[in-house]
Regions:
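Acidic-basic catalytic patches of nuclease active cores, encompassing PD-(D/E)XK
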Residues: 1-34
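Conserved catalytic cores of phosphodiester-cleaving nucleases, focusing on short active-site segments
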Residues: 22, 26-27, 33-71
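Sparse, context-dependent recognition of short Cys/His-centered cofactor- or disulfide-binding micro-motifs
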Residues: 3, 19, 33, 49, ...
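Short, compact, well-ordered microdomains
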Residues: 77-110
Length: 110
């Protein structure tokens, strides 16, 4: 988590609080790290971290957006800012789909 906080500071994002939520709590078996934080203006933000060897396709991007909706119900509040850090090969259609739906995508190919 320390590496993630340093990465977010590098991107000029500072949170008052940042807590990890396990995908298992949302009924998901995805290998993804979920962090919900409150920024300095008081808005909820979601930071997803995804690391894998295979390509992230458009179908999986849809699954990640569905996970965001489940997380909003779990937290009981609207999450306005959505960030995703992907350390895997990324399909251009999946990236476009995420960006169209308000996600800020940081892609670091391995």
């Amino acid at each position: 988590m320390k590496a993630l906080v340093e990465y977010l500071n590098h991107k000029k994002l500072i949170f008052k609080s940042l807590q990890e939520i396990l995908p298992k709590e949302l009924g998901s078996r995805k290998k993804v790290s979920l962090y919900v934080g409150v920024d300095l203006k008081g808005y909820y933000a979601l930071v997803m971290q995804l690391e894998k060897k295979s390509r992230v396709l458009r179908k999986e991007a849809g699954d990640l957006m569905a996970l965001h909706e489940k997380l909003e119900k779990y937290v009981g509040s609207s999450i306005t800012k959505k960030y995703i850090l992907i350390k895997a090969p990324l399909c251009s259609h999946a990236k476009a789909m995420l960006e169209e739906n308000g996600w800020k995508v940081w892609h670091e190919p391995e």
